[in-house]
Amino acid sequence: CDVGMLLSADMDYQDRSEIIFNEIKRAHSAYKLNNGIIKIYHIGRNKKRIFDANVYFWNGIIWENIKIHTDFKKSMKLFSDGSGKKEYDENFLRFKNGNNESTRNYFHCFCDIVKNVKDKHTGGIPQLVGLYNGSKFNGMYHGTIVDGQAYYQGLKMGNIYGMSNIRWYNENFEICDWNTKQREANAMVQPISKRATP
């Protein structure tokens, strides 16, 4: 997005991370009121096409560039944060069965907590971004269908022409048809994870 001014296509993730981190520190130093906590998450791929992640963390005094562990052999949560973190983490402990540690299980839990969260600063419509391995892909926004209504990046979508080229998912993490708002006929059924009794 910087049109080659700071980053180049041949840079490794670590080089990009250091440049971005230093630019954030430089820009932040111009603010007079900067004693609050700030966290900025950065996820990308290295030259081996493996995901890397960092959090750029301002603790009110100094900046830190902290690496997030990403070397997993199966779907895992990289982090949870924000005012809804505690409820999400507690809620996820109750989501278990054959779907445990699957991508859809994390999404089921996320949709459930967004709908039923007690924290007044958390809520709204789930927003979904896909990060894919392979040289042809970068981050891609996906649409979500909640209670028969389509949303894209959290915004309600009417019957807008051209939205069929976006991949749509319902709360079950099933691929849906943009026109019908229903699960596509050939899409895999993704049953909701059963909650364990407390």
Show the residue positions of the predicted features:
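N-terminal nucleophile
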Residues: C1-P198
